[in-house]
Amino acid sequence: METVDSTRAFVKNVKRLIVKVGTAVVTRADGRLALGRLGALCEQLQELNSQGYEVILVTSGAVGVGRQRLRYRKLLNSSFLDLQKPQTELDGKACAAVGQNGLMALYDSLFSQLDVTSAQLLVTDNDFRDPDFRRQLNDTVNSLLSLKVIPIFNENDAISTRRAPYEDSSGIFWDNDSLAALLALELKADLLVLLSDVDGLYSGPPRDPDSKLIYTYIKEIHERVITFGDKSRVGRGGMTAKVKAAMYAAYAGIPVVITSGFATDNIIKVLHGERIGTLFHCDANKWASIGETDAREMAVAARACSRRLQALSSQERSKILQDIADALEANEKAILAENEADVVAAQQAGYEKSLISRLALNPGKISSLANSVRVLSNMDEPLGHTLKRTEIADGFILEKSSSPLGVVLIIFESRPDALVQIASLAVRSGNGLMLKGGKEAKRSNAILHKVITSAIPVSVGERLIGLVTSREEIPELLKLDDVIDLVIPRGSNKLVSQIKASTKIPVLGHADGICHVYVDKSADMDMAKRITVDAKIDYPAACNAMETLLVHKDLAQNGGLNDLIVELQTKGVSLYGGPKASSLLMIPEARTFRHEYSSLACTVEVVEDVYAAIDHIHQHGSAHTDSIITEDQEVAEVFLRQVDSAAVFHNASTRFSDGFRFGLGAEVGISTGRIHARGPVGVEGLLTTKWLARGSGQIVDGDKSIVYSHKDLTQQG
């Protein structure tokens, strides 16, 4: 999910960048060159080079490559007796001399395949003591870059006079990380990217599940909490060296990002402003507030609060919902004022009318929302409901009971009223909740969240419902499959598809709302006109609005189709036809049947009969809601049984496919999936089950001492 992080906005001004790739990225575990990773690296640099970026590469790996080659050569020249003797470590300078040739030959070959010219520059720390060298270095690099050549730097370890330890008071640079930082200053780079074998800087060893990736390094916050693990299998300094080099460059005014070199497109993502890796920036200390509450901490807090909520009685949970309803009505003016500000901003930004329609809270909406919350508070208790009760054996009773899911993440667009519905359902079902609304409803969501959480008692905690305000946090949230139990995306096809592709957490929702109304030849035409008009114009932007009108072929001959068309056009509906309807009605042909207009427009097509209508729905629909209008009960039953959608209606508008209208009190969304919940999802869709066994000392012991009865006691319970 591509997005520009607010702290990465500086990338739009990047012209010259230095990319440093470490030995752990350049080589495989066996010491051989990692051809796949190097190929991906060169492809990224070629793409940037072609886009006008000035790209400089600093590479490690020569010593590692040389060591592997010399070990192989030594093995070939050793007798069996030689191999039994203790093996001495190969001289690093000799390894560097041998490996440099092979490493650069590979870079030259890869870049040549991409029509890019590269140049090798070997340097030592002593070189930088000479001002003339530094001036000449700048001249040479500037000349190469003007010719779109990619300079490749490496420390000339073969002739370096520096000895271990690599860092000392007299050194100018100590490894290729510090060389890259030094070059960034000398060559006036706009960005330094350090590629590692991990995703960035973690609060602890990356393999520790409690370690968290730090997206923006703030020295005052992170210096005292970070624990470094072992360095990589190769290379000199590991993450410690990278952090020191990054801080050196960042405090000199050059942003640095440490990220993984194992991914095939991380450099491109960095330059797109995506929130990957760890950013070091001279202004990072001003961004302490951007640290927000960590996504994991928010989810963990929501779970802790949900367990306290579950411990309350049914009456106490109902009282919370009643307090929320009262708070909504008491703050109606403030809510509507913030919503109006969102609507005005959306209009000025040029948003589509359908989005603005979903965004606006009309007069009376707050009262309606409050009433729906009260209805929910008066519904039967959903938790701890015994679904099945079985006597396993004498004195051994097993119950299947309803239980909360845990923590639910809802990502929704445009509609602030959805926040109220979702939050009230979470309270009723005993779940913790994480909410991420669209930026277009930022003010509305903030005030609604504040009003609702203020009504939650301290004994439960207002962190029961967390509001995520930054879009950049979504990728991090979607990684939390150990603390978030379900994701429900409510929005566009693109949003839902991206969410499903980006997480291991179960996802419940629908990608499209392509709803059909089929008017059969035996339909009551007055009823048909009322239903089709309502299904389209009652709320055109809703996911349960009609998007395709299917009409039996006989109605095209007896005037019924024309009556429907006139009725829709009179209401301002734009019509687009399928191949048959467009020629019959002289209307524009629809580009595709799989199109969700979300506005006063729909597709019309003529079909042979109910079976053709069913086939059309299965081929082009989204399994959301479909309706038939007919007086023929047999045809109606065929449609109801055979249409494989979450909701199938007879002689009713598709707009009834709604949690409130179904009597669910409210809904968190509509699911077109076939697992867990389907159709409008109310309280029951946020529940799972647990097994409760009450015994009297029973043991298995090979089933020798127990007599199973398996008696159903559900009705007796």
UniProtKB/Swiss-Prot annotation:
> In what way is its activity controlled?
Feedback regulated by proline.
Look up the record and give one Gene Ontology term from the biological process aspect: L-proline biosynthetic process
The GO molecular function terms of this record are:
ATP binding; glutamate 5-kinase activity; glutamate-5-semialdehyde dehydrogenase activity
Classification via PROSITE patterns: GLUTAMATE_5_KINASE, PROA
Entry comment describing in which tissues the protein is expressed: Expressed at high levels in leaves and is inducible in roots subjected to salt stress.
Q: Its catalytic activity?
A: L-glutamate + ATP = L-glutamyl 5-phosphate + ADP; L-glutamate 5-semialdehyde + phosphate + NADP(+) = L-glutamyl 5-phosphate + NADPH + H(+)
The pathway is: Amino-acid biosynthesis; L-proline biosynthesis; L-glutamate 5-semialdehyde from L-glutamate: step 1/2; Amino-acid biosynthesis; L-proline biosynthesis; L-glutamate 5-semialdehyde from L-glutamate: step 2/2
Which keywords label this protein?
A: Amino-acid biosynthesis, ATP-binding, Kinase, Multifunctional enzyme, NADP, Nucleotide-binding, Oxidoreductase, Proline biosynthesis, Transferase
Query: Which residues are involved in binding ATP?
Result: 196-197, 236-242
InterPro entries, alphabetized: AceGlu_kinase-like_sf, Ald_DH/histidinol_DH, Ald_DH_C, Ald_DH_N, Aldehyde_DH_dom, Asp/Glu/Uridylate_kinase, G-glutamylP_reductase_CS, G5K_ProBA
**Binding of substrate: at which residues?**
60, 157, 176
Query: What does UniProt give as GO cellular component?
Result: cytoplasm
Q: Does the keyword Kinase apply?
A: yes
Q: What is its EC number?
A: 2.7.2.11, 1.2.1.41
Q: Does this entry carry the keyword Ribosomal protein?
A: no
Which family, according to the similarity comment? In the N-terminal section; belongs to the glutamate 5-kinase family. In the C-terminal section; belongs to the gamma-glutamyl phosphate reductase family.
Name it. Delta-1-pyrroline-5-carboxylate synthase
